[in-house]
Design a protein with these regions (language model features):
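Intrinsic low-complexity, repeat-rich intrinsically disordered segments enriched
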Residues: 1-80
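Surface-exposed molecular-recognition determinants
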Residues: 12, 18-20, 26, 68, ...
Length: 239
């Protein structure tokens, strides 16, 4: 077997060195490298340009936080993003409404979480969505209550997704899930409950609404718009 020993291999018409070998066994290719057959790599590879596999450019993104995944909103720019993004919890202890804004346009699901939420009166709670501003019309919504004291009752609303909490001193726990159906149309479903004195109440949430654009905000308020929040915490998660 013959051995070819050379530091540099250059094509007669090439202006650059095609292949450069060093004493450690490393090989540098001056320009493009095409492999027609199979290639096995047992060491580490560093790619400083674009790597194309099967005609598609491959981009490597290393998540910067445990539990994150590489994510792109346009297929070109990638970032380290949490699989489920948790909002900042808000104490529902004052005011007539609680807003969560800045929801990204790529979001397909939002979970609204209630932890001991109460208001000053008996007006049912509402979850309203928005794009640029809060939408307060056009909802098809039904909310049921199974009450330990008054039995079963159902209410509807066109102003938001209704939580039919019609008894005083309700401290509501549970969640409502908002799902993107198609375009800017969202559907809602949820199950919540509370214990009021010696009675136990359960609530259902359902409905749909079409927004004018991409969802970017969620508001929690009441049907009459005047009852104030006086206990609990509300937060959202989106994905």
């Amino acid at each position: 077997m013959s051995t070819l020993k050379s530091v540099t291999i250059v094509h007669p018409s090439s202006a650059v060195n095609n292949i450069v070998n060093d004493a450690s066994g490393n090989v540098a290719v001056g320009n493009n490298l095409t492999v027609a057959g199979s290639s096995t790599i047992t060491g580490n590879e560093t790619v400083t340009g674009t790597l194309t596999v099967g005609g598609a450019a491959v981009v490597a993104v290393a998540p910067t936080t445990a539990g994150n995944v590489p994510f792109s909103t346009n297929g070109t720019t990638w970032s380290s993003t949490a699989k489920i993004v948790q909002g900042t919890a808000v104490a529902s202890t004052s005011g007539t409404s609680i807003d969560f804004t800045g929801i990204p346009s790529w979001v397909k699901r939002v979970t609204v979480m209630f932890n001991g939420v109460s208001t000053s009166g008996t007006s049912p709670k509402l979850i309203q969505l928005g794009s640029g501003s809060v939408t307060s019309t056009g909802y098809i919504s039904a909310g049921g209550i199974i009450s330990g004291s008054t039995g079963f009752n159902v209410a509807s609303s066109t102003a938001g997704f209704i939580i039919n909490s019609i008894e005083g001193a309700d401290n509501i726990y549970g969640s409502a899930i908002l799902n993107l159906v198609t375009g800017n149309t969202w559907g809602a479903c949820g199950t919540l409950g509370d214990v009021t004195g010696t009675y136990v109440n359960a609530y259902t949430v359902s409905g749909g609404v079409t927004l004018s654009g991409a969802l970017d905000r969620v508001r929690i308020t009441t049907v009459n718009g005047t009852d104030t929040f006086d206990a609990g915490t509300i937060n959202i998660m989106y994905e």
